[in-house]
Each structure stands twice: as C-alpha cells, then as structure tokens.
C-alpha cells in the first residue's frame, strides 16, 4: 500500500504569486484522486484557464486557515476557515486572497 510521508512530499512555489503547492497523495499510484495542500500568500491571485475537456475533472477546495475568493466563470464564492467548495473544472478559475494573512487550503481533484 502506498504511503505519502511528510519527508517524501514534493512542493512547488509559483514565482509570480509566491503560492506554494504541496502534493499530499502518494506519488506513482494510479488513482483518479489527487490531494494537494496550498499555502496562499496575502494579496495573491492565481488564474487557471479551463475549458471543455474530454473527461470530467471535479475539484473540491477545503479552507484550513484564512479566507479566499474563488471565481468560476462569472460566479465568485467567498470561503472562510472550514468552508468547502465543490466545482467542475469546465470554466476559467481564479483564486484570490484579498486579506492581509496567508491562507491554507486543501484541494482534492478527481478525474
């Protein structure tokens, strides 16, 4: 059974926003589910262009600390600690941290 330990996890820092993405799911395990932890700096913004896909990708965002705004297409949701948003990745998505405190959230993706 694959296990992901803290020392084995990889992370990536976006040079533009300072956002840190850490892969939580065990690497090299064939699963349709991925878990990622994100540390999102105060004042940061990250946008993803998503459109029509061959297969459906679902994502849930669960805020652990702080607050963020998520815009999917033209709809914006404000999320605080312990809020969880479920969405299909079929439209552009923008994440914003409009506060003066870093936010931390968990992303669960299923494809």
Predicted stretch roles:
Residues 1-2:
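Short C-terminal boundary/hinge segments that cap the last helix of small helical domains
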Residues 35-38, 86, 100-111:
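A short hydrophobic beta-strand segment most commonly corresponding to one strand
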Residues 95-98:
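Asparagine-centered strand-capping/turn motif at beta-strand->loop junctions
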Residues 6, 10-50, 111:
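A short glycine-rich, His/Asp/Glu-containing loop-to-beta-strand
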Residues 31-32, 56-57, 88, 101-102:
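Short acidic/glycine-enriched loop/turn segments that link adjacent beta-strands
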Residues 36, 49-50, 59, 75, ...:
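Short, conserved secondary-structure segments in the cores of folded domains
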Residues 24, 73-90:
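Short acidic-glycine-tyrosine-enriched beta hairpin
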Residues 37-41, 53-70:
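Short, conserved beta-strand element in jelly-roll/cupin
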């Amino acid at each position: 059974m694959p296990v992901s330990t803290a020392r084995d996890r990889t992370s990536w820092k976006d040079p533009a926003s300072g956002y840190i993405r850490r892969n939580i799911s065990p690497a090299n395990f064939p699963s349709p589910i991925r878990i990622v932890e994100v540390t999102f700096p105060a004042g940061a913004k990250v946008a993803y262009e998503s459109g029509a896909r061959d297969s459906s990708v679902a994502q849930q965002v669960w805020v652990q600390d702080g607050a963020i705004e998520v815009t999917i297409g033209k709809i914006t949701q404000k999320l605080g600690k312990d809020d969880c948003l479920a969405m299909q990745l079929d439209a552009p998505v923008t994440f914003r941290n409009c506060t003066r405190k870093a936010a931390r959230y968990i992303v669960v993706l299923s494809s």
